[in-house]
């Protein structure tokens, strides 16, 4: 009978070395074989090339964690250990670095709220860099008392949370750039991109090429999964969820493994267009307009995101090119475009039963240009609209006032909100960065040249949007003059 290599682990058979592993809490002795350790990693090759260790039969090694260190060496003997507990995963990462093994930072660790204090203490001992700060930002719950942190730490954490990139979509390429146009990442494809979206609160982009949907992690620089799907017309995301729509249904996909686990079927027999709004945990699906009783109407359907059932559907009197949901006053904005004109209407409803009011209120009319984009900004209770001819304006729902912010004197192809007051506008050869808190020429704070082949512009979101908003409000309340900033440089981040 043949024996596997694993039978020699911690066995005295042919063992020529005993190592006592020691950390701050425990110690353990294990029998090893120098030739196996020598082949396993550079740490032991360096050790055994020294005279004293090469002739020793017992040595002591102080390691970051005893259990993780032993499990790492078990792998040299063909023994694999699986443990996804956050502390074990981080200890394994630290120990692999200690032994000189190639390893990637475990960026996808999830820490339960009861472990947050222990987790923060662990990171404090481990050290701060971009990876650990992102991990903290990802896992701190919104309810955590941030005022227990020094101000310099809160500011550093906010810089990590507030880092966003523009996503420029070409025919065969997706490029991530900062607001100055500096390229952060470029992803090239063999086939043309049919649709793309950023999965909110993550470092992932979902895109469709021919009959395959893929999710790409731009921080880890790898494909998370790919899924064959020949019928998809639209993909979109909200609150970390991924949705795809075809001719008759909406499908929710797990953005981690690609598994489908929820469907919203439509009785509407034409191509559906999908929008997702998660404030009240429902999605809205609307189809291509058609003639209904001699009038153009569009079917609007509400689906419960938790239960999966239809809440309500109704016919909107008109053609819908875009819509935005507004949780304030429970209303929706519908955009109707014609050949060279565009109109924005507001329709109100009761959220509890999705009871639609019959009135349709005009809030803005573009007499000389189509409306390319409408964006709801919750922090300002306002709707931003961008017209094809370069006009950018806003409608405030609280005052019922519409005003023009600026005219970029360039054709607008697409637009996206980067932060609560910063708007990125895509023109044929330029990206304009606009401050919507300002008007006229003062609103244009930056612009950079891009290829005319760009068809879509998107923005990455914070890895923890709710925490970012909470820290932003907290920083606004901090009196800088009353706080000592002498420790501002204690935390340094590495690129």
UniProtKB/Swiss-Prot annotation:
InterPro entries: BTB/POZ_dom (IPR000210), SKP1/BTB/POZ_sf (IPR011333). Pfam families: BTB. SUPFAM superfamilies: POZ domain, Tricorn protease domain 2. It comes from the Viruses. Residues 15-85 form the BTB domain. Belongs to the mimivirus BTB/WD family. This is Putative BTB/POZ domain-containing protein L98.
